[in-house]
Amino acid sequence: MGKHIIPQRRGHGSLVYRSPSHRHITEVKHVDQGTYVIKDIIHAPGRNAPLLELMGSDGKKAYQIAFTGAFVGQNIVAGNVDSVSPGTTTVLANIPDGSYVYNIESSPGDGGEFCRSAGTFALVVSHGQHVTLKLPSGRMRDFDPRCRATLGVVAASGIKDPPILKAGTHVHYLRSKAKRPYTVRGVAMNAVNHPHGGGNHQHVGRPSTVGRNAPPGRKVGRLSPKRRRVNGR
């Protein structure tokens, strides 16, 4: 009898594949309307961008994804305002064309889903019935004008520039994100461990395409691929 492949083990939810949520500081969403002061810039396990520890005018503590140029003691504003200074959180309808924004809501009130990792930002292209943004992938996407976003660019844009010189450092980095630190090819395994394993030399030995509705133990390789088009046909 064959053994469970990695996606099946991950779906079972053991401690190896479970996110270490006990190390996470908090779930970072948009802050409530008001004026805040940056008290500290802290590292957040599981994230590649730092967090801003904010203190509101009402004395409540809040957290926000840090932006480039933030400093301790800086005042930032959140709400339905027309300010264009970095760190301001407001609705897309108030943000002028050509501005850089991050932590963009997909639907009004969800707290932010787009452009949250280090160094990312989106460009406000145009306003109309919808607000058009150019995402880091180059894709143009329309958003509801009531969706909120924060002006600026996410901090720590150069976090991936220095090389990771030690394998152990990379292991700890990926484990904080509940990711496997290494990948073993299926053709390099034994037949008991993977559908592509076994044989006198490394080869799949059968068509590597599988259907979209294949059972989990067989769903490896090229998943429901589309026929390659030649000359647009």
Swiss-Prot record:
UniProt keyword list: Ribonucleoprotein, Ribosomal protein, RNA-binding, rRNA-binding
Segments for region (Disordered): 195-233
One GO BP annotation of this record: cytoplasmic translation
Pfam families hit by this protein: Ribosomal_L2_C
GO molecular function annotations of the record: rRNA binding; structural constituent of ribosome
UniProt cross-references to SUPFAM superfamilies, sorted A to Z: Nucleic acid-binding proteins, Translation proteins SH3-like domain
Bias (Basic residues) ranges: 219-233
GO cellular component labels: cytosolic large ribosomal subunit
Similarity comment text for this entry: Belongs to the universal ribosomal protein uL2 family.
Role, per record: One of the primary rRNA binding proteins. Required for association of the 30S and 50S subunits to form the 70S ribosome, for tRNA binding and peptide bond formation. It has been suggested to have peptidyltransferase activity; this is somewhat controversial. Makes several contacts with the 16S rRNA in the 70S ribosome.
Subunit: Part of the 50S ribosomal subunit. Forms a bridge to the 30S subunit in the 70S ribosome.
Name of protein: Large ribosomal subunit protein uL2
Species per Swiss-Prot/TrEMBL record: Thermoplasma acidophilum (strain ATCC 25905 / DSM 1728 / JCM 9062 / NBRC 15155 / AMRC-C165)
